Amino acid sequence: VDKYDDYLVVQFHTQGIEKWKKEIVEALVSVVKPKGIYERSDVMKKKREGGVIGGVGAYCHTPSQLDEERANINSPLHGKIPDKIKITENGHKFWVDVIHGQKTGFFLDQRDKRQALAKYVEGKKVLNCFSYTGGFSVYALNAGAEKVVSVDASREALEMAEENVKLNKLDEKKAEFILADVKEYLRDQTSGAYDVIILDPPAFIKDRHKINEGLSGYKKINEAALRILPPGGILVSASCSAHLSLDDFRFMLSESAGRAGRTLQILETYTHGVDHPELVAFMEGEYLKCCFALVS
């Protein structure tokens, strides 16, 4: 459950919790008293469980049928939801599209990492990769970055990132938005082009059978970023893959640094925020990890 202003967005990831949807929604309405509740659940996760959605006896496989299923579960559960919701996070303002955006519309679990970024970017050239709607970019500009370049493969996300820069009345001349594949963009940059690089990609490891494939993806983007950063540069690298442990993530960073001919010193390590408690019997809940590292 994510709360945006007076609205809630919920995701039901498993068939087990799906059975309690009615009771959960009723409890949220009673306790939180939101103006609206919107559901953004992941069809594919339930499909892997062989579950049932919207009374359909089996999952469909054609694109049109899948789109229809998504419409069945991505819908209002209570009240009305506006097209965009304006939120304030640590004094920064953002537009959130809970209907069409990724996941629930915004990545609230990264807010402490965005806050931590501020002390590293004053007067620096910052590259925000997989920038989405510009969360890290807004924080960097507000903290005095000389220039912030946001790179993402989604035109819609970049357009909202630009709106968020304007919403915070930041210097638009210091912000650049580039529609590109991050891996290709990193490959084309020269050493020293940026002082701080943020890597906040989508999950490269979707399930336990693709760990090696996903690790290869993480290594490639981190190695490419490290080749660009000069000595004294800062790498902010994150992973939201539940199947990748923090120890393995740090080892991946070490390997990437070696391949790039760099040395990394971990300055700070973060997981998800205090509102994402972890069950000791459900280690998959430890999905997010993020390291701030000094390059030499």
Q: Which sequence ranges carry the predicted segments?
A:
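Non-catalytic substrate-recognition/targeting regions of SAM-dependent transferases
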Residues: D2, W20-F106
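Conserved class I S-adenosyl-L-methionine
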Residues: E122-Y132
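Conserved SAM-binding loop of SAM-dependent methyltransferases across substrates and taxa
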Residues: T133-E146
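Conserved SAM-binding motif I beta-strand of class I
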Residues: K147-D152
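S-adenosyl-L-methionine
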Residues: E156-I198
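C-terminal catalytic and target-recognition region of SAM-dependent MTase-like enzymes
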Residues: A193, I234-S296
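Mobile active-site "lid"/loop adjacent to the S-adenosyl-L-methionine
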Residues: D195-A224
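Helix-to-beta-strand junctions that scaffold the AdoMet/dcAdoMet cofactor pocket
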Residues: L229-P231
